[in-house]
UniProtKB/Swiss-Prot annotation:
Function: Catalyzes the tRNA-independent activation of glutamate in presence of ATP and the subsequent transfer of glutamate onto a tRNA(Asp). Glutamate is transferred on the 2-amino-5-(4,5-dihydroxy-2-cyclopenten-1-yl) moiety of the queuosine in the wobble position of the QUC anticodon.
Catalytic EC class: ligase
HAMAP family: Glu_Q_tRNA_synth
Residues that hold ATP according to the record: 255
Keyword ATP-binding set for record: yes
Residues that bind Zn(2+): 100, 102, 129, 133
Keyword Ribonucleoprotein recorded: no
Disulfide bond annotation, renumbered to this chain: none
Cofactor names: Zn(2+)
Family note: Belongs to the class-I aminoacyl-tRNA synthetase family. GluQ subfamily.
Protein name (database record): Glutamyl-Q tRNA(Asp) synthetase
Gene Ontology BP annotations: glutamyl-tRNA aminoacylation; tRNA modification
Binding, L-glutamate: 8-12, 44, 196, 214
């Protein structure tokens, strides 16, 4: 019997899915099935300038190749603009957003260089906005002479949440993050299309998502989204930020680390069981000493991980990959 929990797989078709993506999706999948949750597939294609036309179909193929399934048809962000516009208007009425015509160069020139916050230990993931346009109030005229986006007003109250992998995490939202854009730039409000931060919150609210699983490079994004949930009048889901898969240089996987695309391994004839076994062991869900894992079928491996699933088993440290194809069983 399906529970009331709702989880999601949310690939972004900005390129090929790689080993790091696979492990995060597998952990999310095992957690969802362990809860008997409804699992949705959402295609996060809102960042249209970076979207690759072939990447959506390939991502779905990759997920199915690894033995994952989901409930219902895929949800596609680019088909949901009216929902995002409605949420933006709600935020405007509450004076939680304002138009901003600053360029990235303007922001970098006005803001101090990214630094480690003495208050919380975070290194900002983008230049902290200095508030140049923040004096705008709802009802003031919109900019007419240059493109603008809508920027969300962060509240100064210190933010914290419990992460299922890392425990309690906290930040100073003004010092570590600052006001952030919820739309892309355009010449008019009607043409300001939703950006990632707003879209994912609206989508999760609409689907009733109760658990979000993603890489721990997105923890600062979670602080942004927690304030969006509050401003839109909804309680947030629980969060689990899993460690990244990195190269030997400590940086997350990229082309410089060799070809770690799932499609590459599939084309080379690697069985999906190899990747799923690696994800099970490297995540901490399955001990390295479990030699019997190599004898199990794909469905059997999935069922074992679903039966064993517990967030306390998930490692907190990144997994380093070096020449994956030659080091796996």
């Amino acid at each position: 019997m399906m529970s009331s929990a709702v989880c999601r797989l949310a690939p972004s078709p900005t390129g090929a899915q790689h080993l790091g993506n696979a492990r995060t999706f597998l952990i999310a999948y095992w957690s969802a099935r362990a809860q008997n949750a409804r699992l949705i597939l959402r295609i996060e294609d809102i960042d249209s300038p970076r979207i690759k036309p072939w990447a959506t179909e390939q991502a779905i193929t990759d997920l199915r190749w690894l033995g994952m399934d989901w409930d219902g048809d895929p949800i596609v962000q680019t088909e949901r603009s009216p929902l995002y516009d409605e949420a933006r208007n709600q935020l405007m009425d509450a004076d939680r957003v304002y138009p901003c015509s600053c360029t990235r160069r303007d922001i970098e020139a006005a803001a101090s260089a990214p630094h480690e916050s003495e208050a919380s230990g975070w290194t900002p993931d983008a230049p902290v906005y200095p508030g140049t346009c923040a004096s705008w109030k709802n009802g003031d005229p919109l900019p007419e002479d240059k493109p603008f986006c809508f920027r969300f007003r962060m509240q100064a109250t210190p933010d914290r949440f419990f992460d299922r992998v890392h425990g309690e995490v906290a930040c100073n939202p003004i010092q570590d993050i600052g006001d952030f854009p919820i739309t892309r730039k355009a010449e008019s409000a009607a043409d300001c299309l939703a950006a990632y931060q707003l879209a994912v919150v609206v989508d999760d609210i609409d689907a009733g998502v109760t658990e979000v699983v993603r890489g721990d490079d997105l923890i600062l994004s979670t602080f942004r989204q927690l304030q969006l949930y509050e401003a839109l009048g909804h309680s947030p889901p629980s969060h689990a930020h899993v460690p990244l898969v990195t190269g030997t240089d400590g940086r997350r996987l990229a082309k410089r680390h060799g070809d770690t695309r799932l499609s590459h391994f599939r084309e080379q004839g690697m069985p999906p069981e190899t990747i799923v076994r690696w994800a099970a062991k490297s995540s901490g869900l399955c001990p390295d000493s479990d030699a019997a894992l190599s004898e199990r079928t794909l469905d059997q491996i999935h069922q074992q991980m679903i039966d064993r699933f517990d967030w306390v088993r998930i490692h907190r440290q990144p997994t380093v990959v070096d020449d994956f194809g030659s080091t796996t069983d």
